[in-house]
């Protein structure tokens, strides 16, 4: 039995959840102080019943008051821990959804496995499936070379430039096969390890069966892994956020509260990026503010029956998508094929008049927006005065700034401004790691006691919270988020226990 003592005011989330799971939390109060306080309140000195009331106080304290205080303290701590864990889950989920896409490349997805082999799917730059296969690189040297030969033919046939490898079972052997494949091809191809959490859940879902009725469950997961590299957000919205694997103690939390928080995070991310109504799936459209699963399916059905949308206003022809839903969703829906460039921006139709007025005031036209000739727009608005210009256009200054930003980059994807994912052509082994080595890695998970970083080895390394920053922090999320590209220095390597200790604060300054 291990005794652990900590003041209630200083207990942190993971300690509360850990203690809760062991059902061993005990509140330690000063009994004499509690009894003295109780006696002062109810015992009248000199009373004939004084001794009886004192005894009653002791009984009440031991049998009723103390257990009640303990339950209340435990409940308050657990509630606070749940709220903190839910908030942490949301903090981790957002950057995972907002990972920069690797767009427009023919991509090969590899879903590693032993008994059932490695499932392979090749998709084009739009996510359309071109080819599938199953290879068995773990069955022996001959089968491994046969797998490499088959993948090599697929790479050459379809012009594959990127390989996405799931990070689950047999991923180490699959990564080694991919590196050997790239070597035998003579370059021109790079790979990335992809978090495959939830891929198996999606592949066995009704949604996946509707999307890929002709493919086996295992091949669907390979397609999902490839698409996660091309556009993480569009693929991950198809999966229950709880299955993505970036939280702590999610099964112990109030599920309704957790679902509400995570759904809000997903919706915020989808709205921030924007959705192309002519290519988006119903799953993605259903996450846009103002739309639901039914209206999203109606948009896809209308698109299939009538061809691509040619303007935002055309959305009003979609069954069950009324004026209110249009008002709420229009600003987040993009129509690149529209004759009006404003339909491919985040400018809401209600602000089109203001946008055109702003262009006129600054000597521009919509043609200049399409051609990207608005580099001097902020300077021209500044010369006119932001508040004065907003007043002339009858909008607020924040709206004016948003409109100006959208006009300068029509069709922009805010994820493109984030650090690019790390693409590799070679693999590191744990035995290659030495204390003092400085490496670049990708943050895979942020939890209460530290940060897990993918440094290109099969095992993620841990940066303990004490090694995250030179300054004191209460939580690693104050410094890093999931998906961040960070520099780390190797502190220790334990091959037997498969543990890698890393530090961010000890990285030598350039």
Task: Please provide the spans of the model-predicted regions.
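Short amphipathic alpha-helical interaction segments
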Residues: 16-26, 293
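Extended, highly charged clamp/arch subdomains and adjacent linkers
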Residues: 27-106, 125, 148-153, 157
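Long, highly charged, low-complexity intrinsically disordered interaction regions
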Residues: 210-308, 325-355, 359, 397-425, ...
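Basic amphipathic alpha-helical segments that dock to polyanions
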Residues: 2, 25-28
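Single-stranded RNA-binding regions, centering on S1/OB-family and related RNA-binding modules
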Residues: 335-339, 343-510
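Phosphate- and other anionic-substrate recognition elements at nucleic-acid/protein interfaces
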Residues: 84-97, 103-106, 115-263
């Amino acid at each position: 039995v291990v005794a652990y003592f900590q003041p209630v005011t200083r207990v942190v989330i993971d300690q509360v959840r850990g203690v809760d799971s062991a059902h061993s939390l005990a509140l330690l109060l000063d009994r004499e102080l509690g009894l003295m306080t109780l006696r002062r309140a109810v015992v009248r000195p000199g009373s004939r019943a004084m001794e009886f009331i004192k005894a009653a106080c002791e009984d009440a304290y031991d049998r009723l008051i103390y257990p009640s205080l303990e339950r209340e303290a435990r409940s308050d701590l657990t509630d606070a821990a749940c709220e903190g864990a839910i908030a942490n889950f949301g903090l981790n989920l957002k950057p995972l959804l907002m990972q920069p896409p690797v767009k427009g490349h023919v991509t090969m997805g590899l879903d590693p496995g032993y008994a059932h082999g490695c499932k392979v799917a090749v998709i084009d730059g739009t996510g359309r499936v071109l080819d599938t296969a199953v290879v068995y690189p773990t069955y022996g040297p001959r089968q491994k070379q046969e797998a490499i030969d088959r993948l090599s033919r697929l790479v050459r046939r379809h012009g594959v430039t990127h390989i996405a490898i799931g990070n689950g079972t047999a991923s180490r052997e699959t990564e080694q096969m991919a590196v050997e494949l790239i070597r035998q091809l003579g370059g021109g191809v790079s790979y990335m390890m992809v978090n495959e959490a939830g891929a198996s859940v999606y592949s066995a879902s009704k949604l996946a069966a509707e999307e890929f009725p002709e493919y086996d469950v295992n091949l669907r997961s390979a397609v999902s892994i490839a698409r996660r590299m091309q556009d993480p957000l569009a693929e991950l919205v198809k999966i229950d956020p709880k299955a993505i694997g970036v939280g702590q103690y999610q099964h112990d939390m109030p599920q309704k509260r957790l679902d509400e928080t995570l759904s809000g995070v997903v919706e915020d991310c989808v709205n921030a990026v924007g959705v192309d109504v002519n290519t988006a799936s119903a799953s993605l459209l259903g996450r846009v503010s103002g739309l639901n699963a039914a209206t999203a399916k109606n948009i896809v059905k209308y698109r299939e029956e009538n061809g691509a949308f040619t303007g935002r206003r055309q959305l009003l022809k979609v069954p069950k998508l009324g004026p209110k839903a249009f008002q709420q969703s229009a600003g987040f829906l993009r129509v690149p094929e529209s004759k009006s460039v404003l339909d491919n921006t985040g400018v809401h139709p209600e602000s089109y008049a203001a946008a055109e007025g702003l262009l006129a005031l600054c000597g521009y036209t919509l043609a200049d927006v399409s051609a990207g000739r608005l580099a001097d727009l902020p300077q021209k608005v500044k010369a006119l005065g932001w508040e004065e210009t907003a007043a002339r256009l009858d909008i607020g200054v924040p709206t004016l700034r948003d409109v100006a930003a959208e006009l300068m980059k029509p069709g922009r994807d805010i994820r493109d401004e984030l650090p690019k994912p790390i693409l590799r052509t070679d693999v590191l082994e744990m035995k290659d790691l030495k204390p003092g080595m400085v490496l670049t890695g990708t943050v895979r998970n942020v939890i209460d006691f530290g940060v897990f970083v993918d440094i290109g080895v099969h095992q993620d390394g841990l940066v303990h919270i004490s090694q995250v920053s030179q300054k004191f922090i209460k939580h690693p999320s104050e410094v890093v988020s999931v998906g961040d590209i960070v520099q780390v220095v190797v502190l220790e390597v334990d091959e037997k226990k498969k543990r890698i200790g890393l530090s961010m604060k000890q990285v030598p300054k350039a």
